[in-house]
Amino acid sequence: MGRTHELSQQAVDVKEVTAQDTAKLTVQGQTVELPIVAGTEKEQAVDIASLRGRTGWITLDPGFANTGACTSGITFLNGEQGILRYRGIPIEQLAESGTYLETAYLLIYGSLPKRAALERFNRAVLENTSLPQGMERFFDCLPKTAHPMAALSAMVQILSAYYPNLTDPNPSPERMEEVILALLAKIPTLAAH
């Protein structure tokens, strides 16, 4: 089953930011106060979500090098320092001591699984690995020179034709879990083709 149980989830101490913490931006004599927010690892950010609505101004950040697209308790990334963490756990630790399904469980449910939970999760995924009958013929429609990611993407899209009940744009939590398990199970099978 899992190689881990050496993995440990680290609590990340996040600096408290109060409502009084703001940044002032002045352009052409007009000043706006924008809230300061703290990220998952104490990095500070200016929340500019209201800037355009309040002033008509936008920001420019080529390549989004200084832009966080959302707040996330799932992933922390700092490319300059070579840091990637999932739920506070360094990716190197997950790669060395964890499995694909343990990491998936961590990302989905927010914590590393206990042995019994991992066994149930592994079983649920393994029960869904086979592809629908006839789907293999779609591989023959792809050029032999197709990029692997293009082929995988196309095949994932084709899966939705076989599972129309899983394409609800507003799924219940149970249905969402069903979709996640199906994709976790079938993507390695698709990639193996």
Where are these regions (language model features)?
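Hydrophobic alpha-helical bundle cores within soluble ligand-binding/oligomerization subdomains
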Residues: 5-193
